[in-house]
Amino acid sequence: MTILSIVIPAYNEEDGITEIATRVLAVTPDLKKAGVDEMELLVVDDGSRDKTAEVASKINGVTLVRHPKNKGYGAALKTGFAQAKGELIGFLDADGTYPPEYFPKLCRSALNGAELVIGSRMAGEKSEMPLVRRIGNFFFATLLTILGRQKVTDSASGMRVFKREILEHIYPLPDGLNLTPVMSTRALHEGIKIEEVPIPYSERVGRSKLSAIRDGRIFLQSMMWTAMSYNPVRILGLIGLASMGIAGLVSLWLIYLRANGVTTLDSASVAALFLGMISTVAGINVFALGITFNYLVALFYKKPIKQGLFGKPIFKTPLDQQFGWMGITGILAGLILG
């Protein structure tokens, strides 16, 4: 028997909790058509100072879980995950921005092999998302696509369905609003099968709790550090290549000047030469640091390196087994150039 547990984290949502809970409960017949035998709805009151808990407790079909004090969006979701009894777990916000009517579509994908199904607000359906947040979500989705080497259109969607078994692979997760982008980042790097289903997005009920600047910074920091813990060379390697690219451009410019008969460098050319030298040294060192960190990550997790800068790692055998020929190559290169 397939059970779907839907978790709604709620903080000061007395005006909207009844409507969203009622809409979730109303999709039960469609869930059964999609292959879900039973659905449970958990509302996690995250220390609300209004009547959210009181209102939710009076809704038939709702299991209320309470935090004595506010712990954060992510903490409320994790409490719900721990209380859920279903092998499928879904969640959405309490503010009415996400359409629970799309849960059957998400569940079909999950029952057909996907391990994490994300309702994408950026994949074509009608969206009332503010322009600033739309730009931010596009940026984070593009960043995650680069870091995880898989196309992602919405890295921070708050409507998802996933199989319970993936929790052990994507934990730990943060307590704040950055839970969703970190979940996406971990899932990509853990090789979890992800699918996206286009969903509409509505204007929220009440005032938004999301700050574009503050939470955007937290999202970026969380995603970068999470990716670094799996594949450091993906980030450091790109930085190193960019630095060496700058050095290459400077070199081409100096070669161009020399080809045109310039034999004396002015102050700007000297500064460019210095920039090129610094960029070369910095690029090589940062790139090498990324490779070293990847090796340390593999040692820490006691697993072989699965990823590299452009996908699969360059060295399938441990890096220390490559030091001999790498050293000889370096010596020969030095003798030739010298």
What does each model-found stretch correspond to?
Residues A21, K32-G47, V65-R66:
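Short beta-strand/loop segment that forms part of the nucleotide-sugar
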Residues V65-Q83, L88-F91, T97-L177, P181, ...:
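Acceptor/aglycone-binding surface of glycosyltransferases and processive sugar-polymer synthases
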